[in-house]
Amino acid sequence: MPIVMARDLEETASSSEDEEVISQEDHPCIMWTGGCRRIPVLVFHADAILTKDNNIRVIGERYHLSYKIVRTDSRLVRSILTAHGFHEVHPSSTDYNLMWTGSHLKPFLLRTLSEAQKVNHFPRSYELTRKDRLYKNIIRMQHTHGFKAFHILPQTFLLPAEYAEFCNSYSKDRGPWIVKPVASSRGRGVYLINNPNQISLEENILVSRYINNPLLIDDFKFDVRLYVLVTSYDPLVIYLYEEGLARFATVRYDQGAKNIRNQFMHLTNYSVNKKSGDYVSCDDPEVEDYGNKWSMSAMLRYLKQEGRDTTALMAHVEDLIIKTIISAELAIATACKTFVPHRSSCFELYGFDVLIDSTLKPWLLEVNLSPSLACDAPLDLKIKASMISDMFTVVGFVCQDPAQRASTRPIYPTFESSRRNPFQKPQRCRPLSASDAEMKNLVGSAREKGPGKLGGSVLGLSMEEIKVLRRVKEENDRRGGFIRIFPTSETWEIYGSYLEHKTSMNYMLATRLFQDRGNPRRSLLTGRTRMTADGAPELKIESLNSKAKLHAALYERKLLSLEVRKRRRRSSRLRAMRPKYPVITQPAEMNVKTETESEEEEEVALDNEEEEQEASQEESAGFLRENQAKYTPSLTALVENTPKEHSMKVREWNNKGGHCCKLETQELEPKFNLVQILQDNGNLSKVQARIAFSAYLQHVQIRLMKDSGGQTFSASWAAKEDEQMELVVRFLKRASNNLQHSLRMVLPSRRLALLERRRILAHQLGDFIIVYNKETEQMAEKKSKKKVEEEEEDGVNMENFQEFIRQASEAELEEVLTFYTQKNKSASVFLGTHSKSSKNNNSYSDSGAKGDHPETIMEEVKIKPPKQQQTTEIHSDKLSRFTTSAEKEAKLVYSNSSSTPFSGPTATLQKIPNTHLSSVTTSDLSPGPGHHSSLSQIPSAIPSMPHQPTVLLNTVSASASPCLHTGTQNIPNPAGLPRCRSGSHTIGPFSSFQSAAHIYSQKLSRPSSAKAAGSCYLNKHHSGIAKTQKEGEDASSYSKRYNQSMVTAELQRLAEKQAARQYSPSSHINLLTQQVTNLNLATGIINRSSASTPPTLRPIISPSGPTWSTQSDPQAPENHSSPPGSRSLQTGVFAWEGEVENNVYSKATGVVPQHKYHPTAGSYQLHFALQQLEQQKLQSRQLLDQSRARHQAIFGSQTLPNSNLWTMNNGAGCRISSATASGQKPTTLPQKVVPPPSSCASLVPKPPPNHKQVLRRATSQRASKGSSAEGQLNGLQSSLNPAAFVPITSSTDPAHTKI
């Protein structure tokens, strides 16, 4: 594109200059300022860092723009400046346009600044950024204007000076307090206390009351980082960027005093939480509500969906920011007047950290001098790059070579100065030359009457005031994503009296800026009086006007990604390169004009330019008001259509014969503004809404039918096109189901070329539009026949509406549809909710497409699904931050034994509906004779159904061949008992043996945060069992006293805690949850053990291997001394433990037991167990030796009764012989609970001091179980190493266990 700097500057003819001005005006990086728009100011584009565009770099290179970075290293700032043609100079150089520093500036450096040079700090900014100075300033404002008016900080004390006051306050309220150093950042030196004795008084610190009721999202604490730009302190001008960051802690919030030292729970600083192992980062810049860092807009949209008033919240946040800066305004403005030679030399970007409590009241935590610009995640780059680019644009870098400031500029322009910059008015030495030039420009444009113009308002103003007024208005025109929160017509009335720096600039700016708004002073003053009378700093709802709602809509909108910005700028650039219409290529005689004509044309052109900017801003704001509710469609256009003003210009040119003034004046005539009508309580009828939606779809179809144009076929372009077409496919799939007429959808295959797919998709969309329009016509006919008058009353004028539809662009239709959907709280009017029954069963897999991207062609209209599909949809908005993309599913393992018949009823396994899965599938298994089932693994989330035992089988195979299925299974109980919905439930009495063998071969690893709770639960459970057995009760009475509901509640709590950690799943945590589930099974079977088993059943260990059989011990009468219930329970427990030991031993040594059923060599559990046992061989040997020595030292002198005898069978396993009385009835063997591997050490039960019970050692104190062959043999012979020990009681003997 031709630019003025690339041409030969020797040609100084007037025609050449005019052409150069025209070319320069079209450049995307130039915005013209000054009275006659003669001073070029550089416009920054955030997407420039993605590509090396010479068209953007050429401006900075032509003017030799430069920067230097001192005492900091900001890669983002360096990248943006370099991409716009700046070059970096040495830190000691004085020829620069920008000095970016990380510390405060010395006064002598500020005095040497020229008018074109800028620095990123004001003098004495530490009045805000040092915590002690900020506290002092806020306290001073509280004393002056009242405590409640400036109650924006928690109760704070400065130690050691105010230590006595702090102790006095602590004695009244002993809540937690937070200690912060007065001059630190990134969470360094911050800790919590609950006693004054814990504070070190060696240095100055700040102690603030800890806000113990923060607003939580998914039970996690968070704060908000806000970016505040101040361009001037005299007059005070404050901007707030529309996007920020919500930073989450990595540990769920708990008010308990035991967690007071957990910084990952109470501190939200990124520098602190990134060190946590639970920190989650998001790699997709379009996903803003996942991980430990959200965008502020995503947080606000979430709160709005939860029913919170985000408009009032952001009004309170603006109130907090303005009051904070006003508290330090006097000191900083005084320093600027003393040290800074030019008002525009300094600007400052502050980082405000705000915490929101449960009542939606924002609290100021701190103000950062140089907020972090590090981009550790794509979301950081998107937000911070856009913010920095918009900030540089607002500040306004004049395109001027910094080397020019060394020479004294002449009073009048010379040839050399005009050659270096022909578009900038020559300036004298400061300060008179700039004022003279501005005054001349202002006098020449005194006839301007449009809104926002200076017009006749310059009368009575000094030169400096005129210059300040012009600069503030131009800054606001270039604000981009920044929102000016002070001064505005509302905030000036509320906070103007708080200003302490008494100068005329603030008053002049307020009166001149807002004089065309009528007289809102009375209503605003009434609102302020009401607020003052109430004594509360909160803004009343009545005073929240339309501007506050507009600001809230801007804060809630999603920020465009850099890729979308790049494509939009490229499309606008292509439009600018098209041939100009006759309006531009005027006859040569039009260049010869008087000065008055030129000024009049310039006024009209400026009016048109400002109106176009205002219309664009209003359109953007209206588009971003879209509601993020469940059924609101997100309609975002990727490519803006060519403006229709060109066709209007052509028609006017042909009719008027070249009178440009009349042409452009006629374009100012107001047109039918449908959005404004909707905002003014107007509404569309249902037919009109469908007509508008059909017109929007037609625009999308036309865009699909267009060629790719000059677009280069790259991988990124193809991916974006594919993604956008996928969204149209998803829309057609869902929308076609709601049509009353049948429509056959033949969607293109993904194997086709992109252009072919676009053509087919456009054809299908056209067929859909035809059917859709027919249904709309039928609806209109029904309405006319029924003569429903309210439709005509609700709808707008039909003629104007049809004219609007004919002329509206895609963006305008999108804005109307978005606002209409937000206003009516539903999108069902576009497609309805009617769906034929034949289509209800259609389910489309949409998991492959991404949603909610601002650059997509269109978003699918979300229709309320049928009832039968409501449970299958994914609703993960609230939990999306902590859920991973892949879900762990349970594995169903069943074994086959052909020798043993199965006479019980078949078990049907059905899949439990899972909210994390996109659909529900039912898996029905009907095992034949000899089949039984067991779940080898369980999901991380366990339902809280009580666990019931199943009927014991006579003989069950000991090994299983794995068969994998997905999902968690529901197992109907053959005995008619309630279903057990836990994944660890087993069919068959000993099917948990396989899980036990699998668990014994693994190493347990739990997070430190979960150890305490798990240990406490297990210890409490076993101590409760021992206490019950101590009282000599039998099994049935013990089960009656045992409160199973408490175990169920604890199990549910543990399951919820583990489910919250699904983003960092661990198979070891699942194993622990399985053991707690089995524990519930074991306790629930006791009270049914005597009645559920035939008297002939008594399982013991056979000499030949792990085969369960029923057998009587001939030595039973000799050793009989136990009650029937205790004896039976004891026998079953030891038999089960022996089976586990035997199987683990056989797997570790490789000696296969002689049994008619041999496990397959490819068994998953066998290979996994052998692998894990081999890895733990050396460690387990040492742990076994230590455990054996410890227990032998403790129990060496003890003598145990000979009630049970354990004998070893050579290499084949262990045999347990139990003695029972001849008249004793055997009981059912319960489901044995297998503890975690870390608790399966060689353990000898410790005899109680009173010889009435056998205590079980705490799980956390037991060493890891050995897996080697030697460890198994030695452990079973000398240490009595069962898998888990169940206490046995007797009313006569102190113990019944014999080694």
From Swiss-Prot:
Residues 589-626, 832-853, 918-941, 1088-1130, 1217-1275 are annotated as: Disordered. L-glutamate binds at R247, Y270, S271, K293, K384. Its cofactor is Mg(2+). Its main location: other. Residues 597-617 have a biased composition (Acidic residues). InterPro entries: TTL/TTLL_fam. Residues 1104-1130, 1217-1230, 1258-1275 have a biased composition (Polar residues). Belongs to the tubulin--tyrosine ligase family. Polyglutamylase which modifies tubulin, generating polyglutamate side chains on the gamma-carboxyl group of specific glutamate residues within the C-terminal tail of tubulin. Preferentially mediates ATP-dependent initiation step of the polyglutamylation reaction over the elongation step. Preferentially modifies the alpha-tubulin tail over a beta-tail. Required for CCSAP localization to both polyglutamylated spindle and cilia microtubules. This is Tubulin polyglutamylase TTLL5. It comes from Pongo abelii (Sumatran orangutan). The lineage of its organism: Eukaryota, Metazoa, Chordata, Craniata, Vertebrata. The gene is TTLL5.
